[in-house]
Design a protein with these regions (language model features):
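Canonical Radical SAM [4Fe-4S] cluster-binding loop centered on the CxxxCxxC motif
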Residues: 63-105
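Core AdoMet radical
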Residues: 92-107, 113-209, 214-224, 246-253, ...
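Auxiliary Fe-S-binding modules of radical SAM enzymes
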Residues: 1-47, 243-395
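Generic structural signal for well-ordered alpha-helices
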Residues: 58, 73, 110, 137-141, ...
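Catalytic cores of alpha/beta
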Residues: 159-168, 214, 225-240, 302-312
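Conserved, mostly hydrophobic/aromatic
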Residues: 57, 85, 123, 176, ...
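N-terminal cationic-hydrophobic initiation segments that often serve targeting/anchoring roles
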Residues: 42, 61, 114, 145, ...
Length: 395
């Protein structure tokens, strides 16, 4: 039985005849050998104790990545959105304080992050063509590229020709989480906007690859559907992408639901929730099955847990993150407003202390310097820069 995914020799593969959305349902009915291996490992009675998996995962990680941890920061540029997603603080019908940063304000935020050491920034925006309009992201990339060498995007899905243009302006990475791979749950949770289209989002990584992206991140938001189903689907998706988009590097993440605007009292459903031990087990399993994949853990997770898993398989961590536009410097706070049915509505009163509403609450509130110190204490080298244009000549 195949126990790991070997990327060697993939250049011989011809382009896929069908997109992942076309084969996904069939894969769930007839799992590949790698998926069957996942199912074996995820159950403790057949996969062995967590301690053994964690030790093996640590060894494989050191072999492929050395004793390093790549650090990045999300930079939210807009919390406007046309989608209604019942689990998201940016949801269209949420009565939140919204703003979209100007390009100059994006630069202000990025220079602040640069001063903290970051050279790897993820630009994040809600999906709203009126506010995050044609050319906006390109202008942001043009302004940041001279001093931020590693730029990635987490924005609404696009056509492959749009991705080609984005890549031409300096973006090298794209992150798109399916949220949930359970089609019925997805339909229930997404009630308005282009995000309603399950297959359009599912095939987004392939369009990004066709558009020229060579660093692609996928994941599911754990807590929306049964965590074992989500993890198996994520395994299937990652295996498909490795086989059919073989020139790209991939990262995978297992973000867990956190309190958010509209539901700050959020409590996880015990029937769906990914508990800590299972979370660590997934990190170890994905490392063993996909030795070359990057594994991302964000500040959604508590500091003690992040410290404990830093050496076990994780390769990328965010640090000091803010999940609202202007969160690092207060940029854009002078333009706060509501958006109702696509129309901007001014606030009736402003105290001067308001800020844009965050997408969700983070858990690890330590500064980037504190996270870096923690990593060094674990004998890991914090890596702030993860890309150089000269590497493009090698692809």
């Amino acid at each position: 039985m195949e126990t790991t995914f070997d990327v060697r020799g993939l250049a011989k593969h011809s382009p896929p005849a069908m997109a992942f959305a076309d084969v996904f349902s069939e894969l769930l009915k007839r799992p590949t050998p790698l998926m069957r291996r996942f199912l074996q490992l995820v159950a403790e009675e057949t996969g062995g104790p967590l301690e053994t998996l964690a030790r093996q995962s640590q060894q494989v990680t050191r072999r492929h990545f050395g004793k390093t941890m790549r650090l990045f920061a999300p930079l939210y540029v807009s919390n406007e959105c046309v989608n209604n997603c019942s689990y998201c603080g940016f949801s269209r019908d949420a009565g939140i304080y919204r703003t979209t940063l100007t390009v100059d304000q994006v630069v202000t935020e990025a220079r602040h992050l640069h001063g903290l050491g970051f050279r790897n920034i993820l630009l994040v925006a809600g999906e709203h063509p009126k506010f995050v309009s044609e050319g906006y992201l390109q202008n942001c990339l043009d302004a940041l590229k001279p001093f931020i060498p590693t730029l990635a995007l987490e924005v609404g899905p696009m056509e492959d020709d749009q991705y080609t243009e984005i890549v031409g302006h300096g973006a090298e990475g794209l992150v798109v989480y399916q949220e949930t791979y359970h089609r019925e749950t997805y339909t229930q949770l997404h009630t308005a906007g282009p995000k309603k289209n399950f297959d359009w989002r599912l095939d987004c990584p392939e369009r990004a690859y066709a558009g020229g992206f060579r660093r692609i991140g996928i994941g599911a938001l754990f807590g929306l559907a049964n965590w074992k189903f989500e993890a198996l689907a994520l395994c299937a998706h990652l295996e498909y992408l490795y086989r059919n988009c073989w020139k790209a590097q991939f990262t995978v993440a297992f973000p867990r639901m956190r309190p958010y605007a509209g539901n700050y009292e959020y409590q996880p459903d015990p029937e769906l929730y990914l508990p800590d031990k299972a979370f660590v087990r997934l990190i170890a399993i994905f490392r063993l099955l996909f030795p070359q994949v990057g594994i991302v853990v964000s500040t959604r997770e508590p500091a003690p847990l992040r410290d404990a898993i830093a050496t076990l398989g994780v390769t990328h961590m965010s640090a000091g993150a803010k999940t609202e536009p202007g969160g690092y410097t207060g940029a854009g706070s002078d333009d706060l407003h509501l958006t109702i049915k696509g129309r901007r509505v001014e606030l009736q009163e402003k105290s001067g202390c308001e800020k844009a509403t965050e997408q969700f609450q983070i858990h690890d509130t330590r500064s980037p310097a504190e996270v870096a110190a923690m990593l060094r204490g674990l004998n890991l080298d914090p890596v702030w820069k993860d890309w150089d244009e000269s590497l493009l000549a090698l692809t």
